[in-house]
UniProtKB/Swiss-Prot annotation:
Subunit structure: Forms a complex with EsxO.
Name of protein: ESAT-6-like protein EsxP
Keyword terms: Secreted
Tree of life domain: Bacteria
GO cellular component, one term: extracellular region
Any coiled-coil regions, as ranges: none
Localization: Secreted
The keyword Secreted is assigned to this record: yes
Family under the similarity heading: Belongs to the WXG100 family. CFP-10 subfamily.
Location (main, coarse): secreted
Naturally occurring in which organism (per UniProt): Mycobacterium tuberculosis (strain ATCC 25618 / H37Rv)
Length: 98
C-alpha cells in the first residue's frame, strides 16, 4: 500500500500558530513563577539561602526562555517552509503551463 505525502501550507501555518500559543503560555507562566519567587525571596530568607533560591530560579527562568526560543524556532521554520513550498509550487505550475 503506497503512502502519499501531501504538503499543506495552510496546515503548516495553523500549526505554527499553535506553537506561538504554547510559547506565549510558557512565557507567561515563567513570568508568574519569577514574580512569585521574588515575593517569597524577601519573606524570611536571607544570606546563602536567599542567594541559592534566587540562583535556582534564575536557572529555571533561563530554561523556560530556552524553551520559548525553541518553540519560536519551530514556528518560524513552519512558516518559512510553507512559504517556500508555495513559491516552488507556483514556479512548477508556471513551468508546466508554458
Amino acid at each position: 500500500m503506497a503512502t502519499r505525502f501531501m504538503t499543506d501550507p495552510h496546515a503548516m501555518r495553523d500549526m505554527a500558530g499553535r506553537f506561538e500559543v504554547h510559547a506565549q503560555t510558557v512565557e507567561d507562566e515563567a513570568r508568574r513563577m519569577w514574580a512569585s519567587a521574588q515575593n517569597i525571596s524577601g519573606a524570611g530568607w536571607s544570606g546563602m539561602a536567599e542567594a541559592t533560591s534566587l540562583d535556582t530560579m534564575a536557572q529555571m527562568n533561563q530554561a523556560f526562555r530556552n524553551i520559548v526560543n525553541m518553540l519560536h524556532g519551530v514556528r518560524d521554520g513552519l512558516v518559512r517552509d510553507a512559504n517556500n513550498y508555495e513559491q516552488q509550487e507556483q514556479a512548477s505550475q508556471q513551468i508546466l503551463s508554458s
